[in-house]
Amino acid sequence: MLSLSKNWNTLIKPNRVTYENFPETNNKAKIIVEPLERGFGLTLGNAMRRVLLSSLQGAAITSIKIPAIEHEFSSIPGVQEDVSEVILNIKGIEVKMHVSEKRIMKLKATGPCVVTAGMIDTGHDVEILNPNHVICNLAKNKQLEMELTCKVGKGYVLSTNSYEDNLPIGEIAIDALFNPVKSVTYKVENTRVGQVTDYDKLIIFVETNGDVLPEMAVGLAARILQEQLQLFIAFEEQEEDKQVKTDSLPFSPYLLKRVDELELSVRSANCLKNDNIIYIGDLVKRTESDMLRTPNFGRKSLNEIKEILAKFNLRFGMDVPDWPPENIQELSKRYEDSYN
């Protein structure tokens, strides 16, 4: 019976994740994942984007209370904007909460001034992430007082679906955008593994409001997907005793890996091929001097291969007992799960 694990173990697995922050801010990042099986870039990119934009926890202002104002179709004495405009501006305030319980913030201002989010008294548990965001314009000798309720949630919640069905008189519910991720885009490019050049490279661009860093947001999205997909694994995996298999060889099974599966430059790969170096075991038995005598093989190619071998605690000039084995092709196929 075909081993179930071959369904996923034979697929190439991503082994590089690179995070690149933009110099002007820590809230934007480019995340590069490679290599992926062809088609997996689009599959994972779309899934990650949808989760990032819909499912992460964040904080937002959910309601406001202004003295003598009972609904949004009113005007505030001394304030240039009407209540609807003020609410629209308040929806743009980005907040970060350090507790899970709701908090009430207070705003007091005396005109003439431009009232900004930075004027809100948040206390110790809430942080305003865009303090220069304009709320309204206040006329001379006029005062504005306001209470703002802040909560933790996820997604986008309409004021008509407020968490509290029975708000006190004078408290106005507003639409709340809890998601800390502001934008997500992705693209898929080709990447090279050995001599194969059409594997996928997934590049994700993420911007957050500062509540979480982009790399943390991506990690949370991946964890959410993992949790949701776990239920679909409705079979018991067969435990394979890889240790027994490995111990039956007098050398590391990694030496059975073909050199054309390494991420070598075209020049280096061609030199090895022309010199009939097929497996890593063939390669590590050569000394550095042997390699430099190979036609068209220079110091740059030597350093490239040394760097790759070092990742697996291998080097040139190794003594490999019983190499090459008589049934090397059969062994290479049998032990491929051990080195993939």
Swiss-Prot record:
InterPro entries: DNA-dir_RNA_pol_insert, DNA-dir_RNA_pol_RpoA/D/Rpb3, DNA-dir_RpoA, RBP11-like, RNAP_asu_C, RNApol_insert_sf. GO terms for molecular function: DNA binding; DNA-directed RNA polymerase activity; protein dimerization activity. Its EC number is 2.7.7.6. It catalyses: RNA(n) + a ribonucleoside 5'-triphosphate = RNA(n+1) + diphosphate. Residues 1-236 are annotated as: Alpha N-terminal domain (alpha-NTD). It comes from the Bacteria. Residues 251-340 are annotated as: Alpha C-terminal domain (alpha-CTD). Transmembrane segments: none annotated. It is an enzyme of class 2 (transferase). GO terms for biological process: DNA-templated transcription. Keywords: DNA-directed RNA polymerase, Nucleotidyltransferase, Transcription, Transferase. GO terms for cellular component: cytoplasm; DNA-directed RNA polymerase complex. The N-terminal domain is essential for RNAP assembly and basal transcription, whereas the C-terminal domain is involved in interaction with transcriptional regulators and with upstream promoter elements. Belongs to the RNA polymerase alpha chain family. DNA-dependent RNA polymerase catalyzes the transcription of DNA into RNA using the four ribonucleoside triphosphates as substrates. HAMAP family: RNApol_bact_RpoA (MF_00059). Homodimer. The RNAP catalytic core consists of 2 alpha, 1 beta, 1 beta' and 1 omega subunit. When a sigma factor is associated with the core the holoenzyme is formed, which can initiate transcription. NCBIfam families: PRK05182.1-2, PRK05182.2-5, rpoA. This is DNA-directed RNA polymerase subunit alpha. The gene is rpoA.
